[in-house]
């Protein structure tokens, strides 16, 4: 995924306040260059170690951290953009819209995005079938699908 292109399109003509990449660090040394690339592209990189339990189960969960950060920053933001298709973020979207007056946009691969997330988001951008947002550069534009407009109180 070409995160620089996603960031460029997501911010469009808006002022970027913060772009945070939530990453999981494993023992793979190759990921360091990926994390450095995200940093150079303007992302603040927040990192957690991959947890490996005695049973062999691996867990890497940023859901609560992402939700806390979004809620802490919401009073200073008009728009929150989530790049995820995970339906676990549906309550966060509702909270940001109803309690903080934020517009919430979701950018994700449509085929794997929760239908509830798509329904709740003020705008949804489907990355499926758009080569511009893959590492091979294409020339197509990302399209947001407008659903509704919320005004700040």
What are these regions (language model features)?
Residues 1-153:
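Terminal and domain-boundary accessory regions
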């Amino acid at each position: 995924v070409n995160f620089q292109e996603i960031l460029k399109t997501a911010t469009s003509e808006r002022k970027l306040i913060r772009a945070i990449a939530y990453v999981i660090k494993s023992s793979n040394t190759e990921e360091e260059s990926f994390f450095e690339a995200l940093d150079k592209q303007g992302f603040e990189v927040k990192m957690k170690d991959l947890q490996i339990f005695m049973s062999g189960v691996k867990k890497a969960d940023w859901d609560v951290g992402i939700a806390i950060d979004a809620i802490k920053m919401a009073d200073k933001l008009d728009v929150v953009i989530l790049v995820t298709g995970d339906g676990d973020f549906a309550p966060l979207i509702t909270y940001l819209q109803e309690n903080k007056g934020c517009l919430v946009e979701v950018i994700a691969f449509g085929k794997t995005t929760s239908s509830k997330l798509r329904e709740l988001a003020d705008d949804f951008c489907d990355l499926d079938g758009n080569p511009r947002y893959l590492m091979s550069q294409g020339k197509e534009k990302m399209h947001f699908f407008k659903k509704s407009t919320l005004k700040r109180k």
